[in-house]
């Protein structure tokens, strides 16, 4: 599914790919929700793909691009940071579902958090240093609050 969405301050060309089986498909958010979450965190214009994957693909990508041999919740790939940002977010549905259950969070809220988190990474935010982490977490919390979701760090 691909669609252009425009807000007063941002234009988003979004493709959502679902490389997952029926069980994970049932647990994954709709394209409309993904678009809503991405736009809420976007400052400027972007062309991006959100790819929802299973554990095997998530593990392979994390190993190949980060040198870590396990599936992680979200991976961010930035391709262009000019006037129109271009990049991909890859979310591993079984990992996101497992984390939500382990942390006692609603699955939808956890997906929203990870899309917002990934969108901030696409725009250059990071959390390696403590001051960067604080800034990024504050932004995530603010964006999620505007969407009606609780603070993911509380």
UniProtKB/Swiss-Prot annotation:
Name the record gives this protein: Endoribonuclease YbeY
Oxidoreductase is among the record's keywords: no
UniProt xrefs under InterPro entries: MetalPrtase_cat_dom_sf_prd, YbeY, YbeY_CS
Species this protein is from: Aromatoleum aromaticum (strain DSM 19018 / LMG 30748 / EbN1)
Record localization: Cytoplasm
Keyword line: Cytoplasm, Endonuclease, Hydrolase, Metal-binding, Nuclease, Ribosome biogenesis, rRNA processing, Zinc
PROSITE patterns linked to this entry: UPF0054
Function, in words: Single strand-specific metallo-endoribonuclease involved in late-stage 70S ribosome quality control and in maturation of the 3' terminus of the 16S rRNA.
Cofactor note: Binds 1 zinc ion.
Enzyme Commission number(s) of this protein: 3.1.-.-
Domain of life: Bacteria
PANTHER family (UniProt xref): ENDORIBONUCLEASE YBEY, CHLOROPLASTIC
GO molecular function: metalloendopeptidase activity; RNA endonuclease activity; zinc ion binding
Family: Belongs to the endoribonuclease YbeY family.
GO cellular component: cytoplasm
Matches recorded under Pfam families: YbeY
GO biological process, one term: rRNA processing
Cofactor dependence: Zn(2+)
Residues where Zn(2+) binds: 117, 121, 127
């Amino acid at each position: 599914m691909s669609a252009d969405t425009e807000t007063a301050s941002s234009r988003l060309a979004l493709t959502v790919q679902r490389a997952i089986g029926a069980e994970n498909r049932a647990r994954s958010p709709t394209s409309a929700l993904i678009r809503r979450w991405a736009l809420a965190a976007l400052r400027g214009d972007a062309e991006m793909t959100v790819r929802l994957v299973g554990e095997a693909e998530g593990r392979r990508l994390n190993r190949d691009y980060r040198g870590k041999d396990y599936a992680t919740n979200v991976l961010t790939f930035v391709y262009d940071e000019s006037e129109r940002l271009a990049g991909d977010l890859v979310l591993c549905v079984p990992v996101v579902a497992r984390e939500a259950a382990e942390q006692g969070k609603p699955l939808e809220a956890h997906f929203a958090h990870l899309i917002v988190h990934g969108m901030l990474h696409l725009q250059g935010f990071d959390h390696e240093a403590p001051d960067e982490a604080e800034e990024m977490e504050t932004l995530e919390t603010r964006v999620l609050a505007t969407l009606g979701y609780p603070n993911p760090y509380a």
